[in-house]
Swiss-Prot record:
Domain of life, source organism: Bacteria
Protein known as: 3-hydroxyacyl-[acyl-carrier-protein] dehydratase FabZ
GO biological process: fatty acid biosynthetic process; lipid A biosynthetic process
Database matches in NCBIfam families: fabZ, PRK00006.1
Described purpose of this protein according to its UniProt entry: Involved in unsaturated fatty acids biosynthesis. Catalyzes the dehydration of short chain beta-hydroxyacyl-ACPs and long chain saturated and unsaturated beta-hydroxyacyl-ACPs.
Main location: cytoplasm
Organism field: Shewanella sp. (strain W3-18-1)
Length: 154
């Protein structure tokens, strides 16, 4: 068994996710095992545009954006599970649903969020994943996320 880590830098992430600034919320993938799990990070900076209004005096990362980042991590795992190569043109994984979302800790500027997502099952192009967002080892958010594989017209 190899101890080699599968990583993705931002250049590779951009090949898989259609998101761009300011909505690309994954900075790096530290490791992944296709069909099993993925570990990604987001470095949270005071320069994030959402901090201008949420909240100016005491900035807190909106929970919905933590979930969006987790969904982006699940999309990366789904693509890497389907094919280790660059995704085929016109194929996307859409956020399809969420269950049991829980928020346990605020995320503030200067934090580094670690996203751990695990594939639970896949059937007919619908993937079910469990994800946790951690800061300094503490769970900030957890949820079950569903995503759907769809081909789009180009």
């Amino acid at each position: 068994m190899s101890n080699q880590m599968n990583t993705m830098d931002i250049t590779e992430i951009l090949k898989y996710l259609p998101h761009r600034y300011p909505f690309l919320l994954i900075d790096r993938v530290l490791d992944y095992t296709p069909g099993e799990s993925l570990h990604a990070i987001k470095n949270v900076s005071i320069n994030e545009p959402f901090f201008q209004g949420h909240f100016p005096i005491q900035p807190v990362m909106p929970g919905v954006l933590i979930l969006e980042a987790m969904a982006q991590a699940t999309g990366l795992l789904a693509f890497k599970t389907m094919s280790n190569d660059v995704p085929p043109p016109g194929v996307l994984y859409y956020f399809a649903g969420i269950d049991n979302a829980r928020f346990r800790r605020v995320v503030v500027p200067g934090d580094q969020i670690h996203f751990e997502v695990k594939m639970i099952k896949e059937r007919r192009g619908i993937g079910v994943f469990y994800g946790e967002a951690r800061v300094d080892g503490e769970v900030a958010c957890s949820a079950e996320i569903m995503c759907a594989r769809r081909e789009i017209n180009q």
